[in-house]
């Protein structure tokens, strides 16, 4: 079967902090491993498919090329268009409009996951806990009376931890107003104010459609972050390999959780996955509070499929090889 992997070029990210981090590092500290695109391509080839690569940038010629192409399936790794992350849903809609079969989230699911305030309302409607929140537009505040400090302030319509760093957690009105202004000015979108939940950062990988399966849980251990730094999975922690925060954190299977707690977390993740209409594969980020309560933080459609990332880590813990996971995602997309 002919399978085309669609992925992003770097154009449009040159001005974003961390865009060229790898190039800035000494050679001995650069990561020597395959990219997710290369790993997926190798897996597809091992499974007997004919993979090809097509980089997506902001040029209309690229869309024309996709529309005229004739692969049996497209592995959609595209998270932006022309450097604009809010266009992720539009790209999925484009693939639908031109009749291409593709893996992962639909345009609708991408929209629901991207708009964190809507996602929160949906998961709360389905009986799940999520931190109290308010959306702050320029000039007005809604429901802020329900929130108590400390508060984490995020861009309401961004992903990949953009706009989330140590300064995102605030403890006073002055800090709150300054952070809201920062989000409005830097990201040109509403600010999401969210009750800060102290606890463990748990990732639940989900695989499937009609009967989705929760894979073994993975934890991002934030306990060794520098003193005074809030325990959040911010941009420095996840992506900036130059920082102490990055070096002090790591993800690993959450093997110390008891069976009852594991089942509660997986059940919440499965409910959120289906409520937000994710398909094929996804990841739900949760917080296990010190009280034992499970909070849904956000959904990640089309999570990173790097062999060393949390999704593949969860699959491996459950007995699946990387190639098997890629094969299952391909099969599910073809059955839809």
State where each predicted segment sits:
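Phosphate-binding site of ATP-dependent enzymes
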Residues: 173-267, 290-295
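Short beta-strand elements
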Residues: 151, 208, 298-301
